[in-house]
Curated annotation (Swiss-Prot):
Alphabetical list of PROSITE patterns matching this protein: PPR
PPR repeat residue numbers: 128-158, 164-198, 199-229, 230-264, 265-295, 301-331
Protein known as: Pentatricopeptide repeat-containing protein At5g50990
Organism: Arabidopsis thaliana
Source superkingdom: Eukaryota
Region annotated Type E motif, chain positions: 336-408
Length: 534
């Protein structure tokens, strides 16, 4: 590997010449200098960064990792990337005793500079398993899940560096976030080949990843094959069943947990309440909510109240859900108000929807869209349009739906009306064919979801090209008949897509597993595991 050497005195001279009588050059505390650097976020702040950097060298703080990283990041924000690179290369040229590569990578990842961390890694000669673990874990923290898996693959190319438990735990987390079953199985296989002994963290991670990738059967198999002496493993299984709408299984696991004398915690009950909410088990949910404090002395937290509000709202008890919010001993958060807003949309209660919006101090695009949909579904077009105008005035944009799936070892992504895929023409041809076939079997689009008071034909056109429909058309195009289909989506699936996919599952006699922001939907023979309750 070629190393680039930069003269230390040259760096010092460069910094010292930038000194002036500014406030940054008068600071002596490294903490204050760090704050100054973090406050520099635009090209107009370049001079301040140079002065702070000069003061850092003058005071002998030049090799402090936290200040180094802050300086590099500040240069990047101020469009001085060449200075950021020079500084990093200089630091990498120092002796190993001075240059702590792992600390630098960790610090860069913490502030979201994964690109710079990767450059540091490329120029570092003294890499070890910790170095790579910091890269993999950092990518996961920065929501770069595919990069995390690439890092694991690159790590395996070194004969003297072997992945350990931390490597695998982070990689499994990446697979879970992606819903990538192919790579989840690959990581699991690597663990077995490496002879890794499972601990509670890895056991729960395996149960969790298979559940989140849509393979609840394998998740169950793993659960019953490992030592279940830690509550986290039980929680992973209960939560997995909850997201798949398998209430009976989740409740059974809780009973087994009690029989094996494993004490539940607050996460256990959150999983149970979520299960009850997703499956419409109102009375059972109320019982578990009371059981928490009555038998186990676990005081309900904000998320438990949120689950109860969600449970009541989904059951159509929207007014009762609002009354629970009003009686809470804890200040309700935005999640709870959004839950009320969502149930107000489902059960067409614009009055409570407006109350929810008023209590969202920083309402997001999805909140306004929900309120707009409430008005649209009740034919109050003028009110719906006012909400959209308010969004436009406030500069709030609707979050775009995105769907993705793994096929052929690659992640394929789609957005509504997408034409960027290499096989776009074939995808749309398959989709149009499916739309016509489902229509001939009696499917009717749910045009109440479309905002504007336009013709029914135009409304239907707006619904036909949602991201999950394009993803489904692609996988039908590429996969063999009869195989299971797995698709992920970043936001809640609309009722039109939900009903249409039910129709497709019956039409093609295929199982379609769809994971949206709320839960898993297993479509089979024209039915969904959520029982139209999500």
């Amino acid at each position: 590997m070629q190393r680039i050497s930069i003269n230390v005195s040259g760096i010092r001279r460069f910094c010292i010449t930038s000194l002036s009588s500014s406030s940054a050059s008068n600071l002596t505390d490294h903490g204050m200098l760090k704050q100054v650097l973090e406050s520099c976020k635009a090209p107009s702040n370049s001079k301040c960064v140079l002065q702070a950097h000069a003061q850092i060298f003058k005071l002998g703080y030049g090799t402090y990792p936290s200040l180094l990283v802050s300086t590099v990041a500040a240069y990047r924000r101020c469009n001085r990337s060449y200075l950021a690179r020079r500084l990093l290369l200089w630091f990498l040229s120092l002796s190993p005793g001075v240059c702590n590569i792992n600390l630098i990578i960790e610090s860069l990842m913490k502030i979201g500079e994964s690109g710079l961390a990767k450059k540091v890694l490329r120029n570092a000669s003294d890499q070890n398993v910790i170095t790579w673990n910091l890269m993999i874990g950092g990518y996961v923290r920065n929501v770069q899940y595919e990069e995390a898996l690439k890092a694991l693959k690159n790590m395996l190319s070194f004969t003297d560096i072997k992945p350990n438990k931390f490597s695998f735990a982070s990689s499994l987390a990446a697979c879970a976030r992606l819903g990538d079953l192919h790579h989840a199985k690959w990581v699991h296989s690597l663990m077995i080949d490496s002879g890794i002994e499972l601990n509670a963290i890895l056991s729960s991670a395996l149960v969790d990843v298979y559940a989140k990738c849509g393979d609840i059967g394998t998740s169950r198999e793993v659960f019953y094959s490992v030592k279940r002496n830690d509550v986290s493993i039980w929680n992973a299984m209960i939560t997995g069943f909850a997201t798949h709408g398998l209430a009976t299984e989740a409740i059974r696991v809780f009973s087994e947990m009690e029989a094996e004398h494993v004490s539940p915690d607050s996460i256990t009950f959150l999983g149970l309440l979520t299960t009850c909410s997703h499956c419409g088990l109102l009375e059972e949910g109320k019982e578990y909510f009371g059981l928490m404090s009555r038998r186990f002395s676990i005081q309900p937290k904000l998320e438990h109240y949120g689950a109860m509000v969600d449970l009541l709202g989904r059951a159509g008890r929207v007014k009762e859900a609002y009354e629970l919010i009003e009686s809470m001993p804890i200040e309700p958060d935005v999640v709870i108000w959004r839950s009320l807003l969502s149930s107000s949309r489902t059960y067409k209660n614009p009055e409570l929807g407006e109350i929810a919006i008023q209590n969202l101090s920083k309402a997001k695009s999805g909140d306004y869209v929900l309120l707009s949909n409430i008005y649209s579904s009740t034919k109050k077009w003028e009110s719906a349009q006012k909400v959209r105008e308010l969004m436009s005035k406030e500069g709030i944009r609707k979050a775009k739906g995105k769907s993705w799936l793994e096929f052929g070892g690659m992640i394929h992504r789609f957005k509504a009306g997408d034409t960027s895929h290499i096989e776009t023409k074939a995808i749309y041809k398959v989709l149009e064919g499916l739309i016509q076939k489902t229509k001939s079997q009696g499917f009717v689009s749910d045009t109440d979801l479309v905002l504007m008071d336009v013709s029914e034909e135009e409304k239907e056109e707006n619904l036909n090209y949602h991201s999950e429909k394009l993803a489904l058309a692609y996988v039908i195009l590429k996969s063999s008949p009869g195989t299971e289909i797995r698709i992920q989506k970043n936001i809640r699936m609309c009722s039109d897509c939900h009903n249409w996919i039910k129709a497709v599952s019956k039409l093609l006699n295929r199982v379609i597993i769809m994971r949206d922001r709320i839960r898993f939907h297993r479509f089979e023979d024209g039915l969904c595991s959520c029982r139209d309750y999500w």
